[in-house]
Amino acid sequence: MIDISKLLDEIKASPYREIVISTPHTGVVTFADLKVGDTVVGPQGQWKEKPGTRLATLERERNPKPILAPEKGEICLIHSDLEGRFVEAGTPLMILRHMLTRAEVEHAILKKALHLFRAPERAKYYFIPKVEKKIRASDAHSVQVRDGMELLIMSRMKREVPLNYTGPDGVIYAIYFTINENMDAGAPLLGVCPQDQLPAIQDVIMRVQTEWTERG
């Protein structure tokens, strides 16, 4: 079993992730009026309809395209020597330091601590009706799973096939797929927690909720 408390302490020691902002295609770079230490924001609004801070503009064939911040963060590096230069696709322009939110810390811990049942291929996924009914009546934690149990329906190109769960016995702790949205092959669909590990995981999630301070 993973040492969940140790994992939380490691995250506390480096409570951020660095995001490299790279060019999506070739073009001439013009940086926005920003400097190292400035704070930028990502998309906002209920539907993320408000774009993030403009970091730079990439112009190709007289067609300028803004490069926007994907997350809230602090600029910690700008490759200002690229100003006005033609660059290839994938060229790093700057680095943002994004301070982790409470929800992101919980998500990171669960991804490490739970058994992740992954999508075998790109498709849409649904619970079988019996399981869906149980989740609606209570919650996902009420569903006990065992190896070989028929659990999901995989829908691809108008073809639906049952998908059996493979992994340790336990309860469904996290659901990562969204109905009517395609999940890529290898993407986690469910996070399953063995029954004997449930108290430890619940304890550390409670610690995150009470101890974690939002920053930035």
Predicted stretch roles:
Residues E71-R85, G90, P168-A185:
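A short, hydrophobic/aromatic-rich structural module that often spans a beta strand
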Residues M1-I11, H79:
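A general sequence property marking short-to-moderate contiguous segments
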Residues Q197-I205:
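C-terminal domain-closing interface element
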Residues P199, T210-G216:
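Helix-rich terminal scaffold detector
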Residues Q44-L68, V87-E104, A140-N164, D184-L198:
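Short hydrophobic beta/alpha edge segments that flank linear recognition/processing sites
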Residues L8-D38, T57-E74, R102-I135, I153-V171:
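Short beta-strand-turn/beta-hairpin segments enriched in glycine/proline and small hydrophobics
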Residues D33, G42, H79-S80, S138, ...:
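Exposed loop and linker-edge segments at protein-protein interfaces
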Residues A185, V204-R207:
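Long terminal accessory segments
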